[in-house]
Amino acid sequence: MNVGVAHSEVNPNTRVMNSRGIWLAYIILVGLLHVVLLSIPFFSIPVVWTLTNVIHNLAMYIFLHTVKGTPFETPDQGKARLLTHWEQMDYGLQFTSSRKFLSISPIVLYLLASFYTKYDAAHFLINTASLLSVLLPKLPQFHGVRLFGINKY
């Protein structure tokens, strides 16, 4: 029973990234994270860009690829219980505008971090590993796949 619910979706996780202003809010939050890290006096600019990239990708990995289920009681009979947020988004359809945006944003941040770190080897390796760890689970070939049984239940 959903008393006082204002949406008509069975699972609100499926359409949240299509809400008005969510992409702008996402970009503003990443920019705000970068400004906060820049305000810490003993961090150099390359370290700040690498930290921005790593923190962004870690948060994206946790919220999109680790957390399962829905925060709501949904009338879908628990179908979303074993799915991550990424797998629930846009009803599982691949290559939607929201999925493209969330796939391109870490790449853009990676390119910015690589440029501002002047392609330093240590920063480059950290940023590349961070990018791959968040980009590979987004590929259609990994939809519903649990490597080594991790996050299976």
Swiss-Prot record:
Q: Does the keyword Nucleus apply?
A: no
Cellular component terms, GO, for this chain's entry? endoplasmic reticulum; endoplasmic reticulum membrane
Its membrane topology, per UniProt?
Multi-pass membrane protein
Location relative to the cell: Endoplasmic reticulum membrane
Give the disruption phenotype, in one or two sentences. Answer: No overt phenotype. Simultaneous knockdown of ORMDL1 and ORMDL2 do not exhibit any visible phenotype. Simultaneous knockdown of ORMDL2 and ORMDL3 show elevated brain levels of sphingolipids, compared with wild-type animals, but remain fertile and show no sign of neurodegeneration. The triple knockout ORMDL1, ORMDL2 and ORMDL3 is not viable.
Q: Which residues lie on this side of the membrane: Extracellular?
A: 127-153
Which residue windows are transmembrane per the record? 22-42, 43-63, 106-126
Report the principal subcellular site. Answer: endoplasmic reticulum
Please give the residue ranges for the topological domain Cytoplasmic. Answer: 1-21, 64-105
GO biological process, any:
ceramide metabolic process
**Its function?**
Plays an essential role in the homeostatic regulation of sphingolipid de novo biosynthesis by modulating the activity of the serine palmitoyltransferase (SPT) in response to ceramide levels. When complexed to SPT, the binding of ceramides to its N-terminus stabilizes a conformation that block SPT substrate entry, hence preventing SPT catalytic activity. Through this mechanism, maintains ceramide levels at sufficient concentrations for the production of complex sphingolipids, but which prevents the accumulation of ceramides to levels that trigger apoptosis.
Spell out the subunit comment: Ceramide-sensitive subunit of the serine palmitoyltransferase (SPT) complex, which is also composed of SPTLC1, SPTLC2/3 and SPTSSA/B.
- Family of the protein in this entry: Belongs to the ORM family.
Q: What is known of its domains?
A: Ceramides bind to ORMDL3 N-terminus and stabilize it in a conformation that physically restricts the accessibility of the substrates to their binding sites in the serine palmitoyltransferase (SPT) complex, hence inhibiting SPT catalytic activity. In the absence of ceramides, the N-terminus is flexible and permits substrate binding, thus liberating SPT from inhibition.
Q: What is the designated name of this protein?
A: ORM1-like protein 2
Source organism of the structure: Mus musculus (Mouse)
- Please state the gene responsible for encoding this protein: Ormdl2
